[in-house]
Amino acid sequence: SIGSGKYAEGYQAIFEALDECCGNHAQWVIQQWQWNTNQAKSLTAVPAGRLIVLDLFSDGNPQFDRFDGYRPQCAVYCAIPNFGGRTGFFGRLPKMADNYFAYKAKYSSVRGVGAAPEAIEQTPAVYDFLFELPWMGSKPDVDRWMHEYASARYGASAARAGSAADKAWNTLLHTALDNTTTLQGPHEAVLCARPSLHVGSVSTWGGSHIFYDTQRLTGAAWDLLAAYDDVKASASPVAMANYANDLVDITRQVLTDYGKSLLEGIATASADTLSTPVFQRRRDAFLGLILDLDRLLGTNRIFRLGNWTETARRAATEIQGYDAATQDWMELDNARTLITTWGDEGPCEQGGLRDYSYREWEGMLRDFYYPRWKYWFDHGMNAPQGGWFATEWNWAHETGLPVGANVKGETGKAAQRRFYSPQPEGDSYT
């Protein structure tokens, strides 16, 4: 390891070894994440042009000005579209268009783009836009680009100018896809949080503040719903698949945002007493919303827990000599643990990684988040005596212990494992 204050010497030694091994045409690609002044000395410890610096969070918190465009080396404008895989429809398209071309004009060292997501399969428009930027000669008209994107996604006729689909995507561009803050990923779904009347964040480094007008996003969802006949008329299976995915995702986001307002209403009603009709109605609506969302997400494979867990079990078959226990290990100790506690109690609690990778998926809402909130409401808005970790661990590891159990059980046998199907159920539109 490189000791404090010895970054320049360390980087020089590493580069010399690289040069000796790979020849004098090799280039070293390095990630920049929360560098300090001493770390920046690596820029001059390596010959000019032989180091490529990835400015990882350019879309949210670019560091080009802080480090003089990373000269004398080359630098890459990068985006982190998602932290932890947390579910949410989110992007910074106008900001990316402004910043990428501004930094290219200011620093000749800035060349090209990169993506550094911690998980994928969220908001494909962000990736399409990001990777088109280097092919554009100048800053694009983002509204025009969004129109062309909708046309490519659903068909030119379905997304013609002024159509329902065209209006939906223009609204999305100026709401959920127009974040200008340093927020690490989308604002978080309070439905997926450890229960509290006031949820500031679901994960340790996230936030639940909604940065756009939710009524406008609701309007976009209605416009997208109204586009069904146009997209269907295109007779394109790809267009229909894209549409179904978008319809579920945008509707999910609208209902998720509504959940935040419901929780705020519950907090107001609880100031009096937990037995008032107003409090009980709002509580029941909140719990019902979680289950309604579960049913909606179940209509699309991408939003099903079974798509995740069965992929993990298939991956286990690549291990030589695998058996059912290997598949359980891959699903329970890896796939399910990652999206709940992240690890054992140390990383989860002391490390702050609980719910860092939460997913708003069918199966998760019904069997993990709903029981957690239901227990809390049923017990006077109190957590289990020993905290939430044991309950979360028991679900991830199929111990069979109920919500509120204060001990971690042993992993359940394969025959007792709850099966989550990856196959969609129902129709996203109806």
What residues fall within each predicted segment?
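Extended, compositionally biased alpha-helical segments that mediate assembly or anchoring
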Residues: Y358-T430
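Intrinsically disordered, low-complexity regions
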Residues: S4, A156, S163, P186, ...
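Short, solvent-exposed, charged loop/turn and helix-capping segments
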Residues: V231-L247, L296-R314
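Catalytic-core regions of glycoside hydrolase
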Residues: S1-R160, D166-A168, L173-D178, C192-G219, ...
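Short coil/turn segments at secondary-structure boundaries
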Residues: A164-N170, L183-R194, V238-L247
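Aromatic-lined, polymer-binding surfaces characteristic
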Residues: S1-Y11, P237, A241-E264, T273, ...
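Secondary-structure edge/capping motif, primarily at the C-terminal ends of alpha-helices
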Residues: V231, A235, A269-P277, G380, ...
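C-terminal substrate/ligand-recognition segments
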Residues: Y212-A235, D249-A271
